[in-house]
Amino acid sequence: MREILHIQGGQCGNQIGAKFWEVICDEHGVDNTGKYNGDSDLQLERINVYYNEASGGRYVPRAVLMDLEPGTMDSVRSGPFGQIFRPDNFVFGQSGAGNNWAKGHYTEGAELIDSVLDVVRKEAENCDCLQGFQVCHSLGGGTGSGMGTLLISKIREEYPDRMMLTFSVFPSPKVSDTVVEPYNATLSVHQLVENADECMVLDNEALYDICFRTLKLATPTFGDLNHLISATMSGVTCCLRFPGQLNSDLRKLAVNLIPFPRLHFFMVGFAPLTSRGSQQYRALTVPELTQQMWDAKNMMCAADPRHGRYLTACAMFRGKMSTKEVDEQMINVQNKNSSYFVEWIPNNVKSSVCDIPPKGLKMASTFIGNSTSIQEMFRRVSEQFTAMFRRKAFLHWYTGEGMDEMEFTEAESDMNDLVAEYQQYQDATADDEYEEGEEEEEEAA
């Protein structure tokens, strides 16, 4: 019932995805051979959201793994949970996308896409009532961004009424892996605006800061960063996998978070923040969780919610707690910080409560916010894009794969439109509407 099909693409996506499955297996008591050895019936009650039950009582993730080069897949396969995946669900090429969006989207990726779609179809047919897809990828490289968005648009064509949720790692402001990141990211956002329902925006730099400042890790590795992401990913779907008092699913989430269809880029946070291996020893209270969850330092993308306003937000609590207390805390947050919420959407914070906490914690919470301040990220990428595109730097790598300059111009203006839309709603007040009507009448006169 209500299955979610997980897809991971490119190096970043596969590494995040591998971590995610470690967390999910742990929560459901599935070991790295797919055998169940948990201690509670609740772990099995809705295990089929993320797993197929195979012969011999093994649980196999509903996961499709794709990449344009074999390297990362090999390391996933030889990793701790590598043997749990279905071998047919690894789909990879040999050539690599070389950080080139056009290779991922038009040439190399397009050659591989049909084999990926075959696997997706096969997995979807195994589902009772498929709820939607979750895609892990980065927007800075070639495969996750180019081929990832190609796959998303193909799935959109074939399953138009299913939810499409992405976990997208944006290029960081200061830490850059490749020079052409702004190109790849802008071309990807252009696709995500059209074809995804909900995008959880992540950012390595913000994750580094959390590891460094809050978790006091001197030299955070990608493993530590992905550990944070996977905690959030697990939190977003816990309501589907465990019984709860206030449930939410991907569609309820979308209905409550997206006031305008294009504005579906969310910042995410998690509390309590703990480093790998060391769980905090003091039990947290709901007010403490709430405070940490809304803290700007806790956001996993490099945008500061204090620079904008929340259109909507959603708080998912896990553990044994009173729903009344949760509701009081949420109302409390809105009352104390009312200037940070748009006043023309009353009660714009939704909360849900799931009874089962993550492994090793008494209670935890996941935060998803639709804040206008996310425009900072788009704006930053857009500036870098324009700086290079003005000089047509590196463009030949893309046109050589059959792309047209027009596409770049379109993607650029789409990104700028998105920024303008966020700005427009940030500035809007509750009584704007009728004034606009009057102005139009005056102009007509």
Swiss-Prot record:
Residues covered by region (Disordered): 420-445
GO annotation, cellular component aspect: cytoplasm; microtubule
Bias kind Acidic residues: ranges: 429-445
SMART domains membership: Tubulin, Tubulin_C
Residues that coordinate or bind Mg(2+): 69
Record key words, sorted: Cytoplasm, Cytoskeleton, GTP-binding, Magnesium, Metal-binding, Microtubule, Nucleotide-binding
Highest taxon above the source species: Eukaryota
Location(s), subcellular: Cytoplasm, Cytoskeleton
Residues that bind GTP: 11, 69, 138, 142-144, 204, 226
SUPFAM superfamilies linked: Tubulin C-terminal domain-like, Tubulin nucleotide-binding domain-like
Chief location bin: cytoplasm
GO terms of biological process kind: cell growth; microtubule cytoskeleton organization; mitotic cell cycle; response to ethylene; seed trichome elongation
GO function term, MF aspect, one: GTPase activity
The protein's required cofactors: Mg(2+)
Family as reported in the entry's similarity comment: Belongs to the tubulin family.
Subunit structure: Dimer of alpha and beta chains. A typical microtubule is a hollow water-filled tube with an outer diameter of 25 nm and an inner diameter of 15 nM. Alpha-beta heterodimers associate head-to-tail to form protofilaments running lengthwise along the microtubule wall with the beta-tubulin subunit facing the microtubule plus end conferring a structural polarity. Microtubules usually have 13 protofilaments but different protofilament numbers can be found in some organisms and specialized cells.
Protein purpose: Tubulin is the major constituent of microtubules, a cylinder consisting of laterally associated linear protofilaments composed of alpha- and beta-tubulin heterodimers. Microtubules grow by the addition of GTP-tubulin dimers to the microtubule end, where a stabilizing cap forms. Below the cap, tubulin dimers are in GDP-bound state, owing to GTPase activity of alpha-tubulin.
Protein name: Tubulin beta-5 chain
Species this protein is from: Gossypium hirsutum (Upland cotton)
Taxonomic path: Eukaryota, Viridiplantae, Streptophyta, Embryophyta, Tracheophyta
